[in-house]
């Protein structure tokens, strides 16, 4: 009988397990889902009514009176679950906590025009120069009630508190320009959904870029938006890569609230963006975050790199209230949140 060296075979078996543990099956193709992963993940979303809560771009959901809202379309060309973007809305604070979505080299392309209003299937809100019954920004009354918003009535219409007369613009979180691909249903539904008031925060025009400097729109938030939109179009970004995006404003701490419009609607003192880039072919992840003070002074010409921080630092600035990218396996999440990968992102 031939005897085998069990010690050597045990060593090979342990090595095989170690090699297997270096990879991760996070199953995020065309939709960012974190389901199916084999690596430990103790802080992932487990209490939810919509499976979209397991997507990589979705932070850990808050308890209490917060509502997780998923905006979908019937088109699954760019997302296997038809997810456009997701929102967490705090019904007590009556404010958006964050909006999150994915960008790929495919869904960032398109020629869909910016939504300009005119459909009667949405609840009419305020438009600064509007004289007709067309509208641009909408209350989502499918997922929320009108009482879940701060609103007021005037001239037979219900309005939100974000408008120039109050000193602020509608600040998109899921950017309209990030949703220009056509859903094929003929009404631009994908872009139109970004105009829900659940996806808005009040922003100074000098901050969000509606202010013009030397004839061009300028603002540090716009600078960040352009960077996020252009990155999946760059040579760095491969066809199967995914950029996971989460943006928001500070609403949870009194010292991080700039003011309240008419004593009601929160105006964040800071805004942020958190990004994770997955190179699908090599299963490599890179992370970066941006932190901006919300000010009426125009900083549109500033270098974006000066606002870059790690995702871990962003979480600390937010008082650890938000756990970003919690659906990533713990080992990947820890590594990707540790440093701001400015070189990887070309900053």
Regions inferred by a protein language model and the residue ranges of each:
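Domain-level detector for secreted/extracellular nuclease and nuclease-toxin modules, and
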Residues: 23-347
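Bacterial N-terminal signal peptides that target proteins for export
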Residues: 1-11
């Amino acid at each position: 009988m031939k005897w085998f060296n069990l010690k050597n075979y045990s060593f090979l078996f342990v090595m095989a397990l170690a090699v297997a543990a270096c990879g991760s099956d996070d199953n995020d193709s065309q939709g960012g889902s974190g389901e199916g992963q084999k690596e430990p993940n103790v802080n992932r979303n487990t209490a939810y009514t919509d499976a979209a809560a397991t997507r990589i771009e979705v932070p850990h959901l808050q308890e209490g009176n917060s509502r997780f809202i998923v905006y979908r379309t019937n088109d699954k060309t760019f997302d296997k679950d038809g997810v456009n973007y997701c929102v967490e809305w705090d019904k007590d604070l009556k404010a958006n906590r964050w909006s999150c979505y994915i960008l790929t080299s495919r869904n960032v392309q398109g020629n869909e025009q910016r939504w300009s209003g005119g459909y009667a299937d949405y609840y009419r809100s305020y438009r600064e120069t509007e004289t007709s019954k067309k509208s641009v920004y909408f209350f989502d009354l499918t997922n929320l009630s009108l009482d879940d918003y701060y609103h007021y009535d005037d001239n037979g219409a219900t309005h939100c508190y974000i408008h120039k007369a109050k000193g602020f613009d509608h600040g998109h979180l899921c950017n309209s320009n990030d949703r220009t691909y056509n859903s094929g249903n003929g009404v631009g539904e994908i872009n139109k959904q970004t105009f829900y008031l659940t996806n808005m925060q009040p922003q100074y025009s000098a901050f969000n870029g509606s202010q013009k400097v030397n004839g061009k729109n300028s603002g540090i938030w716009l600078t960040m938006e352009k960077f996020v939109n252009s990155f999946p179009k760059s040579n760095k970004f491969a066809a199967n890569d995914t950029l996971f995006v989460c943006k928001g404003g500070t609403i949870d701490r009194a010292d991080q609230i700039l003011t309240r419009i008419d004593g009601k609607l929160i105006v964040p003192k800071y805004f942020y963006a958190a990004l994770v880039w997955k190179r699908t072919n090599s299963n490599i992840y890179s992370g970066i975050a941006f932190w901006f003070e919300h000010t009426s002074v125009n900083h549109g010409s500033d270098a974006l790199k000066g606002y870059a921080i790690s995702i871990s630092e962003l979480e600390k600035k937010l008082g650890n209230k938000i756990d970003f990218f919690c659906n990533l396996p713990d080992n990947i999440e820890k590594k990707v949140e540790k440093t701001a990968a400015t070189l990887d992102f070309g900053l």
